[in-house]
C-alpha cells in the first residue's frame, strides 16, 4: 500500500478477502536442481540439471528423502507474495522458525484505513455478527487513539528539535508515531501482506506440521496454496513428501488431551507464577554460563594461536568488542558469523524469561537466531483482560481511559464468543496486539549483541527498546567486560570515531545518545 493510499478517511466496512498466494520467483526445475546437487557429491565436477534422468529423480530423490539427506532440497528457493493473511497466523506459524526471509507491511508506518481482517470459519449468523462487531470496535478505537495521541507526538517532537511543527507534510509523517502506538488495539485477525522466501526443505517441513495448533485452519489454506503453486511449477518437487501429521497426532494436541485427564491448565495461576518470577523485570536474566567470558577469551586465543601468558582474558575480549580495534563493528552489515575472530562471541550464553505484547513479540521474533519457546495461545486463554499498556498511553489520561475501557470490552466479546460455542482458536482472533505473552528466550552473545545494537536505538519502538535495556543492564551487572562498548550504532561508532555517528540519516531520533553515559528509561522522550 502506498503512502497516498494509506492517508484517507477510515472505512468501517469489513473486508475479509481470501488469502492470496502468488509464486513470484523460483529456481527453474527445482527438483532436477536438487538431484543434480546430490549427484555432485559423488562427482569430480558439478552436475548440470540437463543431465538428470527420470530414473535418477526417482532413485536418488527417493533415497535422499527417505535417508534423511535433506540438504539437497535446500538449494531450491521459492519467493511468494502473500496477501490477506492474519498477523496471528504469521506470528504463530510463518515466523515461528528461523529458516525464512520476509519483508512485511508494517503497522508502524502504514495507516489501517480499511478494516481488512481474517474471518475464521465461525458457525452461526449471530456468532459471525458478534465477531465482526468486535473487529469493527478495534478499528474505531484505533482511529480514536490515533487522533488523541497525535498531539502528544507533535509536542514531544517540538521539544526534542526545539522548533514548532507547522508543515502539513511533517505532521503527516509524525502521525505514523501515533499509529504505531494505536496499533496495540488492532486485532490479531488484522490482515498483512509480505514477500516471503524460503527453501524447498522449509516448505517440506511446513507441510509436515501444517496441522499444528492454534492456526491450523489458516495454515492449511495458505501453506496449501503455496504447495499447489510449487507443484504447478514443478510437479516432481513433492514426489516423495509424506502426508502431514493429523491434528490428533501432533504432540501439542496429544499432550493437552492427556493433561485434561489429570488437571486442566490454569492460565491465571500460570501467569501469576510466571510474573512473580519476573519480579521488577519484563525480561529477566534467569540463566547464563558463569564462565562465558573466560570461554570467549579461550576461543580468541584458540583462533589466533596464543597462550594465556601472551594474552589475558580482558585483552582477548577487548580485541573483539572494542570498535577501535575491530573495524567490522563500525559497519551496519553484520559479519560476526563469518569473521574468524568474532565467532568467539558465540560461546557466552544467556536465557531470559519475558513478558511482552503480541505486537512487540512480532518484532522480537524477527531476530530469528535469538530463539524462544512461545505459548500456544489457546492453552493460555484468560477470561479477564491480560494485556500490555504502552508507555505513551499511560501518560495521556484520555488515551489511557479509552484504552483500558476497550480492553475490557474486547475481552467481553471474546468471552461471549466462547460461551456461544465458538472454538477458542477462532475467538482469539479478536484479541488485540496488546495481549500479553510470556515466553522463554535464549541465545549466544553474538546474536544478542546484534539484536541489542538494533533495538537499543531510539528509533526502535518503546516496548522492545525497554526490554533491550533491561537485558543489557542485567548482563552488564554480571559481566561488565562483555558490555563495555555496547549500545546502538551511534554509541559503537563514536568509540571508533567513525562518522556519521548515527546511521539512520533523516530518521535520526534527535537525541545525542552517544553522549549519554547509559541508556535510561527516563532519558527517552518518546
Regions found by a protein language model. Give the residues of each.
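A conserved ligand/cofactor-binding region detector
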Residues: 1-526
